[in-house]
Amino acid sequence: MAVLCGVCGIKEFKYKCPRCLVQTCSLECSKKHKTRDNCSGQTHDPKEYISSEALKQADDDKHERNAYVQRDYNYLTQLKRMVHVQKMDARMKNKRVLGPVGGHNSNFKKRRYDIDEDDRDSTECQRIIRRGVNCLMLPKGMQRSSQNRSKWDKTMDLFVWSVEWILCPMQEKGEKKELFKHVSHRIKETDFLVQGMGKNVFQKCCEFYRLAGTSSCIEGEDGSETKEERTQILQKSGLKFYTKTFPYNTTHIMDSKKLVELAIHEKCIGELLKNTTVIEFPTIFVAMTEADLPEGYEVLHQEPRPLEHTSTLNKFIDNAREEEDAEEDSQPTEEPVQKETQDASDSDSDSDDDYNPGLSMDFLTA
């Protein structure tokens, strides 16, 4: 049924007053309405009070829509959009004000995640060369990014790493044991890998692999080995250490199921990680045999590296290290080291570690 004009009541309505929603059929009826009802015809004032009776009367016949409610909803949506636009404009303006002017500015510290998603591939992430290691940086806020405390230690005058340990227990027939994951911090690049293993990880190794000559394996006794004793036990244990390998010089977010064995007795941590790729910080797999590794992982006995890119990348890394050393002499690019009460150069305990399994990267695809 056609709705008639609310003024003359003869013709079908064509217009609706923006303020009071009275329906009119012509300009003449619209003017009569404004004079009779003292209506300005302008959009409502959002601060104006609307009584509950008027709100109920604005319902349609089926009580499915309400003009006042719809009007307030549109107003709030528009207000939210306006605030969002102003916030983004202010953020972009701050970037232009704080950004370097006229080329490189050595005093300007570039933000870690100041890259718009529209300007790059969604699978591409920021890359930082740290001590010759290709570090893929995850978006800020992800758990693995928050756990990363790798930085230049000004007190010790060397680089310290965060390392994720994944212990693979010996698998027995009919029994499947869970992996043990732990993140250790402040591991010096000049140490051997086994020297960076703290008490918590060492005690778990004793439990998983029944290491001989340790008090942790004796029932009722807590581990009381010193750092030197733990290092000797691990070196004689026959444990194998692996790390993930990625496509050479990659910049795309991905996970890898391919591992390479590390020569822990020949090189220090800095030399082991050089010319490799890690996601935020290194992940080290520990197992007694290759068969104990998680299902789906493959060990490469020789890490594949394209020879045509080796010399170019090595030259690039050497230049990056020279620039990094020059910046460290003047103003370190890593976050400053906070003062600690304990000796940072010899920390046997894992009090500074995150006893947290960390972020699993299995959901990423190669």
From Swiss-Prot:
Belongs to the BCD1 family. One of its GO terms (molecular function) is zinc ion binding. It holds the Pfam family zf-HIT. One of its GO terms (cellular component) is pre-snoRNP complex. A zinc finger (HIT-type) spans 5-39. Residues 318-366 are annotated as: Disordered. Its main location: nucleus. Zn(2+) 1 binds at residues 5, 8, 25, 29. The lineage of its organism: Eukaryota, Fungi, Dikarya, Ascomycota, Saccharomycotina. Keywords: Metal-binding, Nucleus, Phosphoprotein, Ribosome biogenesis, Zinc, Zinc-finger. It is found in: Nucleus. The modification Phosphoserine is found at residue 330. This is Box C/D snoRNA protein 1. Required for box C/D snoRNAs accumulation involved in snoRNA processing, snoRNA transport to the nucleolus and ribosome biogenesis. Present with 2800 molecules/cell in log phase SD medium. One of its GO terms (biological process) is ribosome biogenesis. PROSITE patterns: ZF_HIT (PS51083). Signal peptide: none annotated. CDD domains: zf-HIT_BCD1 (cd23023). Zn(2+) 2 binds at residues 17, 20, 33, 39. Residues 321-332, 343-355 have a biased composition (Acidic residues). The gene is BCD1.
